[in-house]
Amino acid sequence: MVAIIVHGGAGTIRKEERIPKIIEGVREAVLTGWRELKKGSALDAVEEAVKVLEDNPLFNAGTGSVLTLDGKVEMDAAIMRGKTLDAGAVAGIWGVKNPISVARKVMEKTDHVLLIGEGAVKFARLMGFPEYDPTTEERRKQWEELRKKLLETGEIRHWKKLSELIKEYPEVLRSTVGAVAFDGEEIVAGTSTGGVFLKMFGRVGDTPIIGAGTYANEVAGASCTGLGEVAIKLSLAKTATDFVRLGLDAQAASEAAIRLATKYFGPDTMGIIMVDSNGNVGFAKNTKHMSYAFMKEGMKEPEAGV
């Protein structure tokens, strides 16, 4: 049974009037992925679904990525094939429109798994990806407002103070996008993010770390969203697939993974989506919101929500 699920990030959507547009965004992404999935390729389905989310400035990935402490965009992305365990990822990349597509090229055109920073940018250019500025006016304005507050308080160098201030913008603090699909033969997972607003320059989250934010094998695939450091410490995406190997379906495994995150790091930290090799989808969160949408065989329209 074929299936696909996408997410647009876990956290709190502060401006609730945005919720209908966010739901429409994940719905559009899953429908795009579903069309590719019906052609037979989970890999294409995941890439195209994530690209739709990267191109939507409502989400913190690709266009609309949040800015670092020094006002730059540094994006992370990863994609993984469950049948072969092939994977590709980029971290701290800038100047490209769709990091998920660069990650796929890393997987298909190199012997490596992860390229970072300037090396990832150079590779993207070699692969024909043109220069692109993903910064939006809204993100720049938010960055300027927060930076002004930091300068006024004299706390610009203190990360704990930054953590307190960015709670004023929870809708971008933990926003990540991802997709997981099963085409009847293979499970593929992909994730993309702009990271944490006002993050330290050079900071890398869970998204491009295989096993932490993104993972797929022959039994299940997972894409995580939330506080990246939590997913890294728990190897959460891989752990979730291990739950499936032990006998849980995708939904039960998703819930078990979030219980684990909550046990060690408390509520309001993580969200996850999954698909297993029986075509079951799963999603869970310990945050107020996590936008999601899914389609599987027998459904005429996607289910979507926050």
Swiss-Prot record:
Which is a GO BP term held by this UniProt record? proteolysis
Give the active-site positions: T176 (nucleophile)
| EC main group | hydrolase
Q: What post-translational modification does the entry describe?
A: Autocleaved. Generates the alpha and beta subunits. The N-terminal residue of the beta subunit is thought to be responsible for the nucleophile hydrolase activity.
Question: EC?
Answer: 3.5.1.1
Which keywords does UniProt give here? Autocatalytic cleavage, Hydrolase, Protease
Sites binding substrate sit at R203, V204, G205, D206, T225, G226, L227, G228
Family assignment from sequence similarity: Belongs to the Ntn-hydrolase family.
What name is this protein filed under? Plant-type L-asparaginase
Quaternary state and interactors: Heterotetramer of two alpha and two beta chains arranged as a dimer of alpha/beta heterodimers.
- One Pfam family from the record: Asparaginase_2
Cellular component, GO annotation? cytoplasm
Q: What does this protein do?
A: Catalyzes the hydrolysis of L-asparagine into L-aspartate and ammonia.
